[in-house]
Amino acid sequence: KNSNTENFQPIPLDSIKIKMKIGTKNHSLEFGISNNLFKKLKGISEKSSKFLLSKNNSIRETSKNILIIEFNPIKYQSFFERMPDSNLNFLMYNRRRPAIWNLQSYDLIKKSGCLIQTKNSLSDSNLSKIISNGKSQFEAKISDLFSKESFFESFFSIEGISFWPTFKEYFQEYFKKRAFEFIEEVELTKKLMKKYDFSSILILSEVGPNERIILQLAQEEQIPVCLVQHGINYDTKESYGMNVAKGVLPIESDHFLCWGKTGEEFSRSMSINPEKIHSIGSPIFDRLTFDEQNSLKNDCVLLVTSGPTKEHALDLTIEIIEKYMNAITKVCQLVTKYNKKLIIKTHPSPDELDPSFIAKQINSQIKVIKEGNISPLIQSCDLMIVIGFTSPIVDAHVLKKPVISLTALDNDWGIPTALKNESCLITDIDGLEDNLNSVLNNEHIKNELIQNGIKSSNEYLSHQSNGAAKLIGFLEELVK
């Protein structure tokens, strides 16, 4: 093989897809950059942010410190807006996402008084030496590990035929690179924990690499960790393994701050300690209110997609992908037939299938939006159609919009509450036309869906419009 070619082989998770909104008409551009370039750009922005947020570089010595991990300040806007009124100090540590990336996020953090911790703010010559020594020690262990050639040849084999030699060098390079990255992350987090005395820590998932590090160090220091529910979850017995794999259940966290009664009851049914579970609502819905004036502009159908994922093996089959594409095609055809405008809002995941090529073949006027807040789109639509089980269902119910759930993806996770409490009209592709016609032209059916949706949102979401206050109130009580 050509060694120059081998050097350019991509390593998993070594590149990042970035979606960027262009202009004011929701046009978006997607491009990929290497992980190394992303880290360099993130480092530059963090150094600039430190200068621009000089007033945020001090904390009140008499107040308790709360560490928040990988939070999006725009999504949690009401939470950040309430921080100045609290008697707590908030510090944010984002290693995968930038804390600041536009004027809105900068303004929110500046006004919140939240202290941003970065690699730059934690690094010094002593830490660099510790990391370097750790890598040297681990490199020797890696060499010893991979010297056991017979084990790897046997492990990576099928019916006695080993395929270890075909990817040996690639695997070793990948393993070493990731190990060195984790050594750095562990030491940075240790430095952060020594630098500040934290009374509690907020995380959004238990499975992220930095969250795993935080959970272990927090347990050693006996610092309570709160897992904050950040999206709608399957609440079925069949989905337990999937939910654990996604890190959305409090397996290791000390507290679970769930949205409402539905999440609370599901957690109890999964034998999670009731003392861990706290129904406090969610700051991400605080600014979501029904606007009757704008709601009268109902001039479109909104299709919300949550397509096949790389994490679920069944989603990778040709059959499932074709079924998903056929569902989008059918929606585009029917909405065009009824002379309604159609907007497609995709899931924000970088790996989400872009349906633009499908939509434009049917109707060039169909808009596909990949970035931005979905609430204004829901507010101005006459009807929302969802493919998959996704959080905008709750948004639509709060905003009093009828929802059709189009079954296009097969899984073994059971049927969640929102898809069996009559708050959504459930249909397959064959029944979509009749159901779409019913909701668009039958006010009784439409209003019944809206009323059932309101009831469902009250079960899913407690303390509506007051989630941030409840979250901060819980933290103040926890650490006092």
Predicted regions and their residues:
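Catalytic-core helical/loop segments in enzymes performing group transfer/polymerization on anionic/lipid-linked
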Residues: K1-K480
